[in-house]
Amino acid sequence: MMIRGQNDRQFASDNYAGICPEAWASLHNSNQGHARGYGDDHWTAKASDLIRDLFEIPCEVFFVFNGTAANSLSLASLCQSYHSILCHETAHVETDECGAPEFFSNGTKVLLLSGENGKIDPAAIDRMVRRRTDIHYPKPRVVSVTQATELGTVYSAQELDAIGEMCRRWDLRLHMDGARFANAVAALGVSPKETTWKAGVDVLCFGGSKNGMALGEAVVFFNRELAREFDYRCKQSGQLASKMRFLSAPWVGMLQDGAWLRHAQHANAMAAHLEQSLRSLPEIKLLFPRQANSVFVELPAPVRDEMYKRGWMFYNFIGKGGCRLMCAWDTTEEDVNKFIADLKELLRAGAKPA
């Protein structure tokens, strides 16, 4: 249930936030004169080089419009139609991409794995691979992990190492949906390479939209062989921007002075403040560990409905039926305090409808 309200900033999604100053300034600066189209411009080259510098490895970089395209096209490049993709049962590629991974891979089957708090248990990979090996069953080829997960948790470097080892054992490729990768890196306090290629990740979908950009994700192939003809996939699927500089230039602004990490750190800090405030309310139950920029809570139904009526927006269909409260790069302590004040007032009043 979503009701439009009067609050300037919301907790429904980091997609609600506007464009951060660094991305906006870089986009403005790129809007000078003419530049070659379809990615043959210096902005795209510079953004790609900055990503290579960030991960400290030569890699192939492609810019696409959104996360669904990034995930589905990169997964399609890792497998054939008779293969299967293994992911957590709550993964975005399973629950929120309208079958795009299957569509762009011409029918690759998605098989679901278990694991606590939205994270894949490496043993579940082993069980799924061993389950059937006959010609009548789609052959497992790719494992997809979400970092940070759909439940706001984060894989540690050690957990990713274990998954990477399991992938190597069974000759599986490893894909990372990193729509909130920046928040995961900020939470872990490690270098980006530690939770990507050093752990065995073949391709990362590096999110920009949820971290202060207007739109755009970067598909980063650490296994460069797998990027062969990926540019054709982008073109065929309508993801090759003719004026590519306007898709890639904001990445320059985000990466050149560390804004991508600062904004993620801020969003995480606001979520931590929100979590701490919620823990002081005995009527509120937190559902999952808060590790990145989201907090999942169980609100009494009358309170939830009255919060909607007061103009607060948040999702209540993600996870186990609880409410997801998401902080963004521009969330302030005042926003959190205002939300908590309304919540406290309704809890004291018993949330009786007016």
Question: What does each model-found stretch correspond to?
Answer:
Residues M2-R310, N316-T331, F339-A354:
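Conserved PLP-enzyme active-site core in the AAT-like
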Residues D335:
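Ligand-binding grooves and catalytic loops that recognize ribose/phosphate and carbohydrate rings
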